């Protein structure tokens, strides 16, 4: 087998998020974040495009031949975070107001840390997002 260069500019990184209820997740990503649904696969997965990035929403599932001994599960406890998404914005307070009006569930209003103003919110399954103005 021949080697291929890696990475190359024509590659793309896709984040997989496991969700408990696909319709609720799609509503959140479309209606709250303004993401575009790119493609759906039989009701248990959905590709969305957000800020030039790909996010694959999938429902829970067990091991497969290409990922043995691996379970896909939504966050069990949203208070324990292993990853989060940061959205860099020019106006944190303005984006906070817009997202809050659309239904985003913020942990607190924006906090000014001097060099950065930021606020955190979760999707319906507890995946953590941050809006950050630096």
What are these language model-derived features?
Residues 24, 91:
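Charged catalytic carboxylate motif
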Residues 1-14, 36-87, 94-122, 133-134:
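Vicinal oxygen chelate
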Residues 128-131:
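Short glycine-/small-residue motifs
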Residues 25-30, 99, 126:
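Conserved active-site tyrosine of GNAT-family acetyltransferases
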Residues 19-22:
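Conserved beta-strand-loop-alpha-helix junction that forms the acyl-donor binding cleft
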